[in-house]
Amino acid sequence: MIENLLREEIKGFKNYEVENVPYKYKMDANETPFELPEEVMKNIGDIVKSIHVNIYPDPTAEKLREELARYCSVTPKNIFVGNGSDEIIHLIMLAFVDKGDTVLYPHPSFAMYSIYSKIAGANEIAVNLNEDYTYNVERFAEAVERYKPKLVFLCNPNNPTGSVIDEEDIIRIIEKARGIVIVDEAYFEFYGKTLVPYIDRFENLIVLRTLSKAFGIAGLRVGYALSNGEIVKYLNLVKSPYNLNSLSQRIALEVLKSGVLKERVNYIINEREKLVKELNKINGIKVYPSHANFVLCKFENANDVHKRLVERGILVRNFSNVKGLEGTLRITVSSSDANDYLINALREILS
């Protein structure tokens, strides 16, 4: 009986599943190999003691927004914070998408664009990438003109392919769009190019960011959006009053101030280049160029490779049964030890 009461959009949904097996190295979720910065860890007791857990968190996350504004060279009024960028995608849908509106996004790309579109009852248009997983800008621009979507998502760098779309091409799409264009820059720090300087020039632009990847606090769920003051105001209308807890706000603030980002990002970029170079030497692997902290690889029998990696204690993300990603595994760039262990394991498996 209860199933009959479900909204039609929810019927047939499946839970988001995470592999729950013992592991030596976790390289499946694009997480950083680094723990909290040493100075933050040293002060963690004082940080926790300073938080009054009986009092609700600051609903505006004022201090965190001020620090994020400094980091991004914008003003606090341009910043909206959320419980991970996933929540912000959902809030954008709540604020702007009516049932039957069109949401357009690349395919393959981040799964949450489709999931939240379905929940909103939107009409989904998935624009295929090229066979090599690069953006087909002409195809994308034509789709924006043809379908006149309420929302357009561009993941840059794209997850899970690692491919990017040039700034001038994004601007072209923004100028064609009648709706809002969301540029998801979750992996910005590993790429270095951003649309943030354009948030006041284009009233229909939102840039999404996260502290889960380069800043390494995925477990605290802190994401943020950058846009003009009007869009930020509308997002505040639909968020829950206390959507970001006190501990997340405080530790995020300390991590932003810690000054370790550049060193850690450079480490991951260097490891990424080493990983790509070594993977390309192994017969049976097609490696796609990446501008993020992961590498997408294609195998003749990805399911078997995945199984044998798990047997060796290595978790990678298996996309081989996903339409458009057949035969692929996504590998998170991790510590030097983890990357070397993975390379040696793949040499053994594919020998």
From Swiss-Prot:
Pathway: Amino-acid biosynthesis; L-histidine biosynthesis; L-histidine from 5-phospho-alpha-D-ribose 1-diphosphate: step 7/9. Its EC number is 2.6.1.9, 2.6.1.38. SUPFAM superfamilies: PLP-dependent transferases (SSF53383). The modification N6-(pyridoxal phosphate)lysine is found at residue 213. GO terms for molecular function: histidinol-phosphate transaminase activity; L-histidine:2-oxoglutarate aminotransferase activity; pyridoxal phosphate binding. The keyword Amino-acid biosynthesis applies. The gene is hisC. PROSITE patterns: AA_TRANSFER_CLASS_2. It comes from the Bacteria. Keywords: Amino-acid biosynthesis, Aminotransferase, Histidine biosynthesis, Pyridoxal phosphate, Transferase. Its cofactor is pyridoxal 5'-phosphate. It holds the Pfam family Aminotran_1_2. InterPro entries: Aminotrans_II_pyridoxalP_BS, Aminotransferase_I/II_large, HisP_aminotrans, PyrdxlP-dep_Trfase, PyrdxlP-dep_Trfase_major, PyrdxlP-dep_Trfase_small. This is Histidinol-phosphate aminotransferase. CDD domains: AAT_like (cd00609). GO terms for biological process: L-histidine biosynthetic process. Homodimer. The keyword Amino-acid biosynthesis applies.
